[in-house]
C-alpha cells in the first residue's frame, strides 16, 4: 500500500513547493521593480525567507499535520468586490485552508487591494502560475456549513462572496493580526482622532459611524425589497450611545456624505463628518472607523468589518428587507452580525407603499 502512494504524493509535494517558491520570487521581483529597495523589516511577511529555507509557515504546519512531508493541495479564492468583500474572501480562505489542512494562496489582485492597508501574510499566486493549475471551482454560501470542513480536491478555487464570522471567528486573534493596519495608516487616523474636541474638551469615547449609500440606495428597494438606513435609525443609534457613555464623539464616514450632513443632527457639537467617501481609496475612512472604540453601522461588508476590527459595542440596522426578499436566500443576518451586537429594526414602511 505504501509504495502505491509514492508516485502521487511526492510529485504533488514537489509541485506545491515549486508553486510557492515561484510565486514568492515573482512577487519579490515585481516589488523590487515598482519600489525602492526595502529592508527586510519592511518586506511583507510572505516574502521574508532565509536563503536556506524555502518553506512557508503554512507549509511547515501542513507537513506537521499530515506527516511524512505530504502536502495535500492548495486553496485560493476569487478576488471580487470592494474592500469589505475582499476582506471577507481573504479571511474565509485563511480559515478554510487551516480547517482542511491546505496551503492558501491569494490572487495578485487581492494582494493589491489589501496589502497597502493591512499586514496580511498569505502568499500571492500570480496569474501566470495560476493558469497552469487544474482548478476545481467550489462555490461558498455566505455562512459556514459542516461540509466545508471536508472539502475534496487538491486544487480548489472558492467562488462566491463569503463574509461571515461563522467561517473565521474561532480564529479571531489571527484574523485581527492579518488585518493589522500599517503603522502610517493607523497613525494618521489616530492623529485625526486626537485632534477632535467636543464642546472644547477632548473626548475619551469615539464612536465610528458608517453610512452606506451609493448604489445601495437604488439596489435595495428595486432588487432586494429592502431599505437603507434613514434619519430615524441614525438618531436612535446616536442617542443610545449618548445615554450609555459620557460625551462621546461620533466620527461619520460614508459614500454619501452630503446626505449625512443633511440628515444627521450635528447641533450638539458631538458629530464630526470626517470621511472622504472615496470608494476607490477606502483606507482613510476604514482606518478611522477601526480606531474608534465603538461602531454604528448600517448595511454592507465595509461596516461589518470596521465593527469587527474596532471591537467594543456595535449597533446595526436589522430586518431591513421584507420577509419575501430574495436577499434572504444569499444572506443570513445571524451569520453576518455577531450575537452581542445590537440591532435596531429598519422602517420598512416606504416599501409597503408601493
Swiss-Prot record:
Kindly give the CDD domains that the UniProt entry links to this protein. Fut1_Fut2_like (cd11301)
Question: What's an example GO BP annotation here?
Answer: protein glycosylation
Name assigned to this protein: Galactoside alpha-(1,2)-fucosyltransferase 2
Q: How does it sit in the membrane?
A: Single-pass type II membrane protein
| Species of origin | Rattus norvegicus
Positions bearing carbohydrate: 199
Could you tell me the keywords of this UniProt record?
Glycoprotein, Glycosyltransferase, Golgi apparatus, Lipid metabolism, Membrane, Signal-anchor, Transferase, Transmembrane, Transmembrane helix
Membrane-side (Lumenal) residue stretches? 27-354
Protein family membership: Belongs to the glycosyltransferase 11 family.
A single GO molecular-function term is: fucosyltransferase activity
The subcellular localization recorded is: Golgi apparatus, Golgi stack membrane
In short, the EC number is: 2.4.1.69, 2.4.1.344
The pathway noted for it is: Protein modification; protein glycosylation
TM spans, by residue?
6-26
The Polar residues compositionally biased stretches are 45-56
Residue segments, region Disordered: 43-68
What reactions does this protein catalyze?
Answer: a beta-D-galactosyl-(1->3)-N-acetyl-beta-D-glucosaminyl derivative + GDP-beta-L-fucose = an alpha-L-Fuc-(1->2)-beta-D-Gal-(1->3)-beta-D-GlcNAc derivative + GDP + H(+); a beta-D-galactosyl-(1->4)-N-acetyl-beta-D-glucosaminyl derivative + GDP-beta-L-fucose = an alpha-L-Fuc-(1->2)-beta-D-Gal-(1->4)-beta-D-GlcNAc derivative + GDP + H(+); a ganglioside GM1 (d18:1(4E)) + GDP-beta-L-fucose = a ganglioside Fuc-GM1 (d18:1(4E)) + GDP + H(+); a globoside GalGb4Cer (d18:1(4E)) + GDP-beta-L-fucose = a globoside Globo-H (d18:1(4E)) + GDP + H(+)
Broad EC category: transferase
Q: Which miscellaneous remark does the UniProt record hold?
A: In rat, there are three genes (Fut1/Fta, Fut2/Ftb and Ftc) which encode galactoside 2-L-fucosyltransferase. They are expressed in a tissue-specific manner and Ftc may have no enzymatic activity.
Identify the main location. Answer: Golgi
Segments in the Cytoplasmic topological domain: 1-5
Main role? Catalyzes the transfer of L-fucose, from a guanosine diphosphate-beta-L-fucose, to the terminal galactose on both O- and N-linked glycans chains of cell surface glycoproteins and glycolipids and the resulting epitope regulates several processes such as cell-cell interaction including host-microbe interaction, cell surface expression and cell proliferation. Preferentially fucosylates gangliosides GA1 and GM1 in the antrum, cecum and colon and in the female reproductive organs.
Tissue specificity is: Specifically expressed in gut.
